[in-house]
């Protein structure tokens, strides 16, 4: 039976052992151990049995260069495929590879056209325009017949109840909101006219309710007309009596 030392001597030549002993590492860094030195030149051993030796593993270093992350000019990180799958296992290597794919997609998205960047995003200009349109109401354009009907009703009734508003809106072909808005604007003009005509106070309260006796009712208007007619009749009777007395 052959001694193990003799087998080792058969695997490695004597000059290789001398070169290994002659070289001393200056530090214990991995880079110092794994880098090649000019004075350490070992002829590669031959034979199928030598490929599993310690020196063969250290000299070949199949995965040393791949473990260092390299970045090309585009800034895309490239991860090794075979070392991770061999050393880290399937779950961890698949997770890292998926992360690398995400980095590649994210970095390459900078070179995509503008329409691809904006895909799936709302246009802020269109959103702002829609908000302004929602805040503003379109101005209603009334016809002459509608304006005449509203003015006649406003002369008789400055404030409308809900049933009156519904009836007026249906008769004129308008909505209740349109009638209400028109009445509010018309009352504001009416208040200004009253104040400009010499009125000391507005005919309505700050909350919009009319003051007492500021708006005459239909009964009061009829009584005023009756008194005016009576005054006219009395004036006409008095003038006729005076004429008869003058003739006598």
Swiss-Prot record:
What are the UniProt keywords, alphabetically?
Answer: DNA-binding, Homeobox, Nucleus, Transcription, Transcription regulation
Region of interest (Disordered), residue spans: 197-248
Query: Which regions of the protein are recorded as binding DNA?
Result: 135-194
Domain of life, source organism = Eukaryota
* CDD domains with a match to the protein in the record: homeodomain (cd00086)
Q: Does the keyword Hydrolase apply?
A: no
Output one GO BP term. regulation of transcription by RNA polymerase II
Tell where it localizes: Nucleus
What the protein does comes down to: Transcription factor, is involved in craniofacial development, and in stomach organogenesis.
Taxonomic lineage is: Eukaryota, Metazoa, Chordata, Craniata, Vertebrata
DNA-binding: is it a keyword of this entry? Answer: yes
CC per GO annotation: nucleus
Give the protein's recorded name. Homeobox protein BarH-like 1
Q: What gene does the UniProt entry assign to this protein?
A: barx1
Q: Where is the composition biased (Basic and acidic residues)?
A: 223-234
SUPFAM superfamilies reported for this sequence: Homeodomain-like (SSF46689)
């Amino acid at each position: 039976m052959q001694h193990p030392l003799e087998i080792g001597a058969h695997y490695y030549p004597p000059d290789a052992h001398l070169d290994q002993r002659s070289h001393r590492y200056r530090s214990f860094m991995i880079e110092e151990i794994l880098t090649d030195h000019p004075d350490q030149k070992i002829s590669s051993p031959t034979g199928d049995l030598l490929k599993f030796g310690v020196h063969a593993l250290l000299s070949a270093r199949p995965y040393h260069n791949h473990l260092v992350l390299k970045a090309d000019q585009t800034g895309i990180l490239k991860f090794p495929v075979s070392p991770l799958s061999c050393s880290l296992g399937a779950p961890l290597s698949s997770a890292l590879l998926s992360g690398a794919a995400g980095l590649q997609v994210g970095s390459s998205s900078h070179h995509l056209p503008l329409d691809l960047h904006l895909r799936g995003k709302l246009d802020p200009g269109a959103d702002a325009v829609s908000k302004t349109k929602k805040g503003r109401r379109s101005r209603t354009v009334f016809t002459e017949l509608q304006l005449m009907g509203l003015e006649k009703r406003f002369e008789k009734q400055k404030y409308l109840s809900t049933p009156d508003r519904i009836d007026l809106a249906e008769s004129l072909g308008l909505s209740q909101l349109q009638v209400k808005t028109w009445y509010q604007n018309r009352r504001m003009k009416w208040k200004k006219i009253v104040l400009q005509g010499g009125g000391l106070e507005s005919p309505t309260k700050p909350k919009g309710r009319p003051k007492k006796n500021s708006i005459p009712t239909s009964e009061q208007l009829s009584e005023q007309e009756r008194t005016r007619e009576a005054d006219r009749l009395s004036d006409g009777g008095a003038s006729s009596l005076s004429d008869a007395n003058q003739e006598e």
